[in-house]
Regions:
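Hydrophobic alpha-helical connector segments
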Residues: 47, 62-93, 145-152
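Helix-turn-helix
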Residues: 9-47
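C-terminal peripheral helix-coil segments that are non-catalytic and often amphipathic
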Residues: 77-85, 120-136, 150, 155, ...
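Short, basic, alpha-helical segments at the C-terminal edge of helix-turn-helix-like DNA-binding modules
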Residues: 50-57
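Short hydrophobic clusters on alpha-helical segments that form packing/core surfaces
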Residues: 2-10, 82, 156
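Amphipathic alpha-helical segments used for helix-helix packing
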Residues: 74, 88-110
Length: 189
């Protein structure tokens, strides 16, 4: 419903300290309408993770890796494209996913499991494309696909926070240089 969408797609930065009253006010809904859709703030948090965060990661970082083509090029294109798409708002506020991990990931088991599920799906997509690249002889066979996946995810998520801290796009340019160098390093000769 429209009310459901209003709540889910609010900017819920600072989710942990955000009260239901504040959510209700920001969405222009009544408390009754809120509780019609969500039994609790925890349930809202899980829906935001599922419908907003998971969808964003899937569309931007997982689905592109399933396309046909050179595996290494797909990795490079996916990470480069996503960084270049960030709006000024995205750059200033950092990654909603990473922000949630830092804010609520350690507080509640249900949140931690939902956030880990997204990382696991993303990691598996990267592992699959790396394994495909090894079979197609465009990625070195001796590298650990799991280690590369964790490294790529960590570097991508980390640079978003560093960019937010420094408020400087040079950080993203340096990241892209490092990413390009790293991916060239794992390319099969």
């Amino acid at each position: 419903s429209n009310a459901f969408s209003k709540i889910i797609f609010l900017d819920l930065s600072d989710f942990n300290s955000c009260s239901i009253d504040r959510i209700v006010k920001a969405s222009n809904l009544t408390k009754g309408a809120f509780y019609h859709h969500f039994k609790s703030k925890k349930e809202l948090g899980l829906k935001v993770i599922e419908l907003k965060i998971q969808e964003r990661i899937h569309q931007g970082m997982i689905a592109p890796l399933k396309r046909p083509g050179n595996a290494l090029d797909l990795l490079k294109d996916t990470f480069f494209h996503r960084i270049k798409l960030f709006s000024l708002y995205d750059k200033k506020h950092g990654c909603p996913f990473n922000n949630l991990i830092n804010e609520i990931g350690g507080l509640e088991l249900a949140y931690r499991l939902a956030l880990k599920k997204i990382i696991d799906e993303w990691k598996q997509a990267i592992i699959r494309i790396i394994e495909r690249g090894k079979k197609e002889n465009n990625i070195k066979k001796g590298i650990s696909s799991n280690a590369v996946a964790i490294y790529l995810i960590s570097a991508f998520e980390g640079v978003r926070g560093i960019r937010k801290l420094y408020d400087n796009d040079t950080i993203l340019a340096e990241y892209l240089l490092g990413l390009s160098s790293y991916l060239d390093h794992i390319q099969a000769n």
